[in-house]
């Protein structure tokens, strides 16, 4: 689409094809010290999981060594990881939270 101005300049609109943002999964990693109830609370508070879903994810973390909390664009995933790590440290728990590109 061309736009012509009074001074004779012509501007051409260039079509841009935006690719979707890279997505990252946020994972909680198992440890032998963080209470299961704390993990459930983290999943409810930071990932908006209901109690049943949070409990299922917590059991997956306990059984399999890690559990997926959700999949988000990079900035959101990074923010969630930092929030979880800060909360865990303040509570005195060694809970690990990481993100991986999907």
Curated annotation (Swiss-Prot):
Pfam families: ClpS (PF02617)
GO biological process: protein catabolic process; proteolysis
Transmembrane segments: none
Signal peptide residue numbers: none
InterPro entries assigned to the protein according to its UniProt record, in alphabetical order: ClpS, ClpS_core, Ribosomal_bL12_C/ClpS-like
Domain of life according to the entry: Bacteria
Cystine connections: none
Stated role: Involved in the modulation of the specificity of the ClpAP-mediated ATP-dependent protein degradation.
Subunit structure and binding partners: Binds to the N-terminal domain of the chaperone ClpA.
Family: Belongs to the ClpS family.
Name of the protein in question: ATP-dependent Clp protease adapter protein ClpS
Gene (name only): clpS
């Amino acid at each position: 689409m061309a736009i012509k101005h009074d001074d004779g300049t012509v501007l051409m609109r260039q079509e841009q094809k935006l690719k979707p943002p890279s997505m990252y999964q946020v994972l909680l990693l198992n440890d032998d010290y963080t209470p299961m109830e704390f993990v459930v609370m983290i999943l409810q508070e930071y990932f908006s999981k209901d109690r049943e879903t949070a409990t299922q994810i917590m059991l997956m973390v306990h059984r399999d060594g890690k559990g997926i909390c959700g999949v988000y664009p990079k900035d959101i995933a990074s923010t969630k990881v930092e929030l979880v790590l800060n909360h865990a440290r303040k509570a005195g728990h060694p809970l690990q939270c990481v993100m991986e590109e999907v």
